[in-house]
Amino acid sequence: MHKVIRQMSQLRLQAPQGAALLRSADSSSISPAISPVSPPALQSKSLHTAASAGMLCAKWNKYNYGPRKWLEYNKTVHPPQETDEEPRNAYVCHMRSNIKYSPDKMWYIAAFVRGMSVDEALKQLNFVLKKGATDVKETILEAQQIAVERHNVEYKSNLWIAESFVGKGRVFKGVRRHARGRFGKVEYKHCHYFVRLEEGEPPQHYYQEPQTPEQQYESWMEQMRSRKIINSL
């Protein structure tokens, strides 16, 4: 039996090349309509729900365009001004949507640049060691370019940040493998960054101006004198 198997293997090895060519020609002559269909190959060997996976994120986030109302303020048409009125300062609203960053972390950066001039904000953001600082800086630069090209701003350095805030974007929920067959929930958060640049010099106090000691004393005295004794004459 072993001799027969050995002889068959030798005959297979010594077969002429024409037989192989004939076999390949026969296989190529089969029409594609009746050719055997191979099972579709999987695009990825493992399934991961990370937002950076690409395939799943693109499908889930296909029609998520982000907020649209903020950019509509650029289309506002103001009424003409009188000759004795103070000229209205030019402004531009800009945004960046679906940033892969937590809105809670981005809030610190957005609040940091409020009330600064554009040049000062760009300088300060170079030293902010946070991932979201890059997106904020790029958004401010884009808004600065739009203000010069489309909104008749003469000097690009004559702008200050009038508004800077963050909105919550889409949250992708996934799972993470833990030990002993357990799993943990994971949230991949996104955010939207909004900025409004205004022409002119920034104000000295963006927020409410702090009171002087004399003003604090006057407000305290007024508060004390306005007290009322209950059930008195």
From Swiss-Prot:
CDD domains tied to this protein: Ribosomal_L22
InterPro entries given in the database record: Ribosomal_uL22, Ribosomal_uL22_bac/org-type, Ribosomal_uL22_sf
SUPFAM superfamilies assigned to the protein according to its UniProt record, in alphabetical order: Ribosomal protein L22
Domain of life: Eukaryota
Molecular function in Gene Ontology: structural constituent of ribosome
Gene Ontology biological process: mitochondrial translation; translation
Oligomeric and partner information: Component of the mitochondrial ribosome large subunit (39S) which comprises a 16S rRNA and about 50 distinct proteins.
Name listed for the protein in its UniProt record: Large ribosomal subunit protein uL22m
